[in-house]
Amino acid sequence: MAETSTNDTTRPVTRRAFLKHSAFLGGSAVAASQLEGLRSLLARAEASELLPHGRYALAKAESQIHSVCIQCNTGCGIKAKILNGICVKIDGNPYSPWTLSPHLPYATSPFESALVDGTLCPKGQAGIQSAYDPYRLIKVLKRAGPRGGNRWRTISFGQAIDEIVNGGYLFRDVAGEEQRDVQGLKDLYALRDPKVAKAMAEAAKHIEHEKEPTKKRALVEEFKANFKDHLHTLIDPDHPDLGPKNNQFCFVHGRVKGGRGEFIKDRFTKDAFGSVNAHGHTTVCQGSLYFTGKAMSEQWDYDEKDKKAKWTGGKKFYWQADTGGSEFLLFVGASPFEANYGPPLRAGKITNGLVEGRLKIAVVDPRLSKTAAKAWKWIPAKPGTEGAFALGMIRWIIEQKRFDARYLANANKAAAKEDGEPTWTNAVWLVKVEKDGQPGTFLRAADIGLEAKIAKTAKDGTAYDDDSFVTLQAGRPVAFDPNDEARPVHGELLVDTEVTGVKVKSALQLLWESASEHTIEEWAAICGITSQDIIDLAREFTSHGKRAAADIHRGVSQHTNGFYSVFAWYA
C-alpha cells in the first residue's frame, strides 16, 4: 500500500476548499468561546457528576428560552438552551403538541418543564448553525459593481432606507451607471388620494370587462375626461387598467408569517402605498394545493358582500391525513420522516403505528425517501404524473364498486346528518351537458320547470332569489337545497340520461368518464409504472373503510398541472 504524506505543503489550495475551511473557522470562533464550558460538561458527564440536575446549567429554567422554530413553515415550539449567552442546544418545547405527545399542561411550572424536552427534527437542531453561520446576512448589502459581478459593500440601515425612499444617483461609483437616476418609492407614490384611487379603480374595471373594441375605446376616452387632473399619476393613461404608478412597486416575497404578512402585504403595500402587487411564492411551493382546497371548499350559500346566493366561503387551505388514527396512509410526493408538516408532530405517530402493527404505509415518489424505505410499497412514478396515477386508481375503484356508495348518495346536509356523517359531496348532483358533449353548469329546478326560484331572506335582512339543485331518485328528478338540515335527500350515483329534454349526467358519472379516458394500463404507462402497481394501491386503499387516507402535501402540487393533479387526488 502506498504511503500518503500528511504534510504535503506543495498542494495548491482551491478557492472552494479555502471558502469551506474559512467558513468552518469562522463558525468555530463561537464554539471556541464556549470550549472550556463544553469540556467541563463532558468531564462531569464522564465522572457521573451531572446529577442532581441543579448542577447541570442547561437543565435550569433560567438557562432556557422558549421560542418558535422557523427552519421550516411548521413552526414547532422550541426550547433554546443558553450557556454564557450562547445557544448551545435546541430541543422541542414540552408545552407544544407539535413536539411532545401528550404535551405538558400550560399550568406546569417552568422550573418543572425545564427537565422535560420535546422532540425536534434535524432542521430544527440546525437552528444553531443558521444563527451563528458566518455568512448570515446581518447588515444591508449594496451592489458595488456591475450586475452579476458579485461585488458588494455594506451600508447602514439608515442609508438603505434613505436610498430606497428617495432614489437618486445611487451607483455613481459603478462604471457605466454614473448618470443613472434610480427612482425611489417617493417617485412611485404618485396617486395619494384614496377616494380618487377608488373611483379610478372602479372605472378601470369597467374598461377591463368591456370586450367590444369600439366601446372599450369610448370608455377609455370617458375615463381620461373624468380624471384629467390625475392622468399624470397613471402608468399609461391610454391603458388605465395598468393602474397608477404606485403599482410599479412590487413586494415579492417567499414566505411571510402571520402578523408580518398582514402588515407588509396588506397595510403597507396595498392600503398605505396603493400598489396591488404583493406576490408570494405561488406554485413553486404549494399554491396549487391551497387554491384547489379553496375551490373544493366553496359552498352554495348567501354571500353577504355580493348580497346574493353564489359559490362562496372557500378557504385557502389543504387537508392532511390523520397519522394517529389511520390504518393505511398513502403518501404521494410527501415524506414526513424528513420534511413535511412536520417530522416532530407526525413521524412519531407514524413510527408507533408501524411498530404496533396498526398502520401500513405506501409511498408514491420518484425518490426512495426515508419514508419510502419504511413503506409496504414504494412506487417511483415519474414527476408530474401524480394526477394520472390518481385517475387510474379512481377508474379501478369505481369499476370495482369499492367506494362508499351510501356516503356519496347524500345530496345535502340533512342526508349526511341522517347517516351520521359530518360532510357530504356533490356526487349525485346533476350537471347539464352542452351540445358539444362537455359538462356545463349544475342543473337547477327552474331549468326543467320542477319548481320556481325560491324567495329567501338573509340574516342581514336582504331579500334574494335562490334556485334548487336537482338529483335523481328512482329515475325521477328531485329538487333540493344542499344546506337544508330538515329534509334529507339521497340521489342516484351514476347517471347519464335526459330530464325533460335536458341532457344531464351526475358529478360522479363525469368523474368516472374522465378517469375512463385511458385504460389502467395507459395511466400506468404515463406514470412509468405497471398497472398492477395502481391496482394494488387502489385495492389496499379501499380495504380500510374511513381509516385510509392519501397525504399529498406538497409534491403533487409543485407542477404546472398541480391544480388538476391535486383535484384528482382530493376527488
Residue ranges and their predicted role:
Residues R487, V495, V499, K503:
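Ligand/cofactor-recognition surfaces for anionic moieties
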Residues D322-G325, L329-V332, L511-C527:
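Conserved thiamine diphosphate
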Residues G243-K245, H279-T283, K503, E521, ...:
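A glycine-rich, hydrophobic/aromatic-adjacent loop/helix-cap motif
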Residues D322, K360, R367, T385, ...:
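Secondary-structure capping and boundary motifs in well-ordered enzyme cores
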Residues R151, E178-D187, E498, K505, ...:
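Conserved alpha/beta enzyme-core scaffolds, especially Rossmann-like or related mixed alpha/beta domains
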Residues S369-K374, E513-H518, K546-I552:
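Short acidic (Asp/Glu) and glycine-rich catalytic loops that position anionic groups and cofactors
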Residues A2-N483, V489, T530, W569:
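N-terminal export/assembly segments and adjacent metallocofactor-ligating motifs
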